[in-house]
């Protein structure tokens, strides 16, 4: 399953999100992390000139296991429910909502380690808060605990403010840091369906 939608929120909602989910919002507690994942062994990527390496990222945890940790939970939950209603998806439980900020890098043809957010069946809604050139890379392969697969790129998605992608949470994916814009800001929502 993969859905791309850049026409499910009003312009007012898109602007509210872009003004709320920033480093400048003093109501949000941001944490600087050394990497985007905790993966130690990177999967190989076939037929690609992409180099896999880490960059630091700034993260805000908005909710975890249905526990609301900040106002960003409400914004993320609202985005998810609007998207789900439009696409006929029944939400059972929100597992996690977090905001990620990746800063500009000089690295070329570089992506972060391919990963899955959780190793249980779930869906991911990735909402792009701002326009950026830090693409998301989707792979054909799914997570399997017994092996680290060789990956093939399925598609890349350029971040566009107000757009979101929905995909099977067991599908390997990667982020990348922007090279031309200052920041790439996303809301990452992991959830279960009925």
PLM regions: where:
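Catalytic core of non-heme Fe(II) oxygenases with the double-stranded beta-helix
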Residues: 69-77, 81-187, 192-194
């Amino acid at each position: 399953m993969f859905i791309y939608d850049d026409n499910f929120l009003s312009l007012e909602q898109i602007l509210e999100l872009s003004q709320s989910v920033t480093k400048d919002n003093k109501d949000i507690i941001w944490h600087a992390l050394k990497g985007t994942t905790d993966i130690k062994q990177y999967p190989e990527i076939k037929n690609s000139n992409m180099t896999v390496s880490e960059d630091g990222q700034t993260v805000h945890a908005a909710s975890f296991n249905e526990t609301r940790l900040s106002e960003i939970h409400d914004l993320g939950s609202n985005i998810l429910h609007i998207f789900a209603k439009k696409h006929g998806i029944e939400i059972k439980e929100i597992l996690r909502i977090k905001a990620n900020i990746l800063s500009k890098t000089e690295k070329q043809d570089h992506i972060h380690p391919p990963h899955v957010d959780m190793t249980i069946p779930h869906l991911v809604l990735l909402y792009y808060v701002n326009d950026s050139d830090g693409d998301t890379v989707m792979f054909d392969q799914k997570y399997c605990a017994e092996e680290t697969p060789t990956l093939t790129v399925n598609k890349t998605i350029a971040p566009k403010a107000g757009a979101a992608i929905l995909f099977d949470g067991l599908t390997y994916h990667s982020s990348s840091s922007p090279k031309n814009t200052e920041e790439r800001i996303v809301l990452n929502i992991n959830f279960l369906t009925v």
